[in-house]
Amino acid sequence: MSKVIRCLTTDATVMAMAMDATDMVAEAERIHHPSAVVTAALGRLLTASSMMGILLKGRDDSVTLKLSGNGPAGTVMAVADSEGNARGYAANPVVEIPLKTNGKLDVSGAVGTQGMLYVMRDSGGAEPYVGCTPLVSGEIAEDITQYLSLIHI
């Protein structure tokens, strides 16, 4: 079970959230059998979608994150509900690329550094909200940070 910690200042002007998504990523790895670098990419997107899902107001609301980059993993997508339950997939789950020179997984090499991050929020009503930003780095966290810095929450 993934663990989430949410903190709110007493005047409700600042909110922080942290998540241990180890179990969720392990389950995705068990289901999809991706390579290590795609597991990292999918895990990052699952975690982000789950955290964004928890912030949704309606019980039937959902958020979809779709990363369409120019890397060999192809499209990586994750969908989460308002309880933080998430599921996802990578178009090409097995990508074998060398580690970075620092010994870390090359997530940006797998997903690509050029492309788009799409965020779709469905509140079950009229048209879903769809926003998008160009990829900044392909490291996923930086791309989502860029998106969040550009929208007005």
Residue spans for each PLM region:
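Long, charged interaction segments in nuclear RNA/chromatin-associated proteins
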Residues: 135, 139-140, 145
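Alpha-helical scaffold segments in soluble metabolic enzymes
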Residues: 48-51, 143-147
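N-terminal functional module of multi-domain proteins
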Residues: 2-120, 129
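Conserved small/polar residues in nucleotide/adenosyl-binding loops
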Residues: 151-153
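Gly-rich Lys/Arg/Thr-decorated short loops/hinges at beta-loop-alpha junctions or inter-strand turns
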Residues: 125
